Amino acid sequence: GEKEDVRFDAIQEKLARLSEGLNQDWVDPGLVTKLVIEGLYDGVTTTELDELAAETAASLASQHPDYSKLAARICVDNLHRSTKNVFSEVVSDLRNYMDSESGKHAPLISEEVYNIIMENKDVLDAHIDYDRDHNYDYFGFKTLERSYLLRLDGNVADRPQHMLMRVAVGIHHRKIEKALETYDLMSEGWFTHATPT
């Protein structure tokens, strides 16, 4: 990529935007920005800058738990830039995945769930609320990223909302209204179908 100067105000504006709705009496985007700038080094990429900002915000979570939410939002913002924002397209990529080492078809989605999603893609795509990805704290998001979000060639390919919709469809199959209800309940944090971490 191209080299560009790191701008304090650009980092602070981004962190202020991602801090909206958090406790402004305790969460200080300026402090996080200052600490990030202190940790910079020549040649840092934008992804590394985001990782540094997230780790910096997470390190302040002992001062207030909303710093953990800010850290997760930084990670989610980065994930959203590197993944597709159409659920059915991601599901298609996961179903049609070809292993880069073996060259063989290695689907990550069952044919049955794939077919149900494709038959109902307009409804499912329209129902997903990507803003809900910003509701996780840092530990929760990193757990999802490490253990639950599916990868293609080592890179995370889907988003938390994609995973939740896949789970909801996997549970209810062709009962789409039930799947949407379950998706909403999971994505709003009312319950989860997680394995122990």
What are these regions (language model features)?
Residues E2-T197:
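Extended catalytic cores of very large enzyme megasubunits
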